[in-house]
Amino acid sequence: GWILCYALPEQAAQQSYNFIEDYEISFMIVFIVLVTLLILYIVYENHTRNKELLKYAQTDALTGLYNKETTEQLTDELLSEDENKYHAFLILDVDCFKQINDIYGHAVGDIVLQKFGKLLKGTFREGDILGRIGGDEFGVIMKNIQTKDIAMKKAEELLAKTQAYKIDELKGNNISISIGISTAPQDGDCYMDLYKRADQALYQAKRSGKARVCNYFS
């Protein structure tokens, strides 16, 4: 039989191999980019999920405010960092809340707490600590204020806003709150000390007829 042989220049013979090498390089670049993007996506998703879990652990599910544990923790951290600065601790309690639950039902009671939580957010500064620390009890830490009078005026403002706040589910009836105030560092240098003093002031507000603000005096 016959055998045909072709003699090709070396450059022409290498062209197919060069094409394969270029293709492999392009493929590897695309592969590395895709893997990098996938890793970044996984890291981002994990970070977002961890933030959501942390927020869930720190907040009260009903109102979106801080829960009691986080309120206490943030307050203690603030007081330990800013020992020489003046802060006010307010305890707010919805007056006759048990009657609201008894008359309108617990579902309406939850709505009242939710809407009051929104009212708190709209009244105080973004940097202040707002928490739900009991069933119908809320705590507010007003950071870095000059005098107790500032806290008193803000509490009276909230008192007026609450009494004028319309909640449709209450069918024409409004809610009121009582407020007790203590201050740091005068009345204490930790959450529990400030809570106890503000709670005493709150008790005095309740005894004096509710729907009012009382300061703690040692």
What do the predicted segments below correspond to?
Residues 1-27:
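Extracellular/periplasmic juxtamembrane segments that couple receptor/chemosensory ectodomains to their
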Residues 9, 102, 141-146, 163, ...:
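Residue-level recognition of strand-loop junctions within catalytic nucleotide-signaling folds
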Residues 25-41:
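Selective detector of the "anchor" transmembrane alpha-helix that sits immediately C-terminal
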Residues 39, 46, 50-53:
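Heptad-repeat alpha-helical coiled-coil signal-transmission segments
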Residues 54, 58, 67-88, 95-125, ...:
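Conserved long alpha-helical elements within nucleotide-processing catalytic cores of c-di-GMP signaling
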Residues 89, 138, 177-181:
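A structural signal for short, well-ordered beta-strand segments
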Residues 132, 160-178, 206:
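Catalytic core regions of nucleotide second-messenger enzymes
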Residues 152-156, 170, 184-217:
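Catalytic-core segments of nucleotide cyclases and related cyclic-nucleotide turnover enzymes
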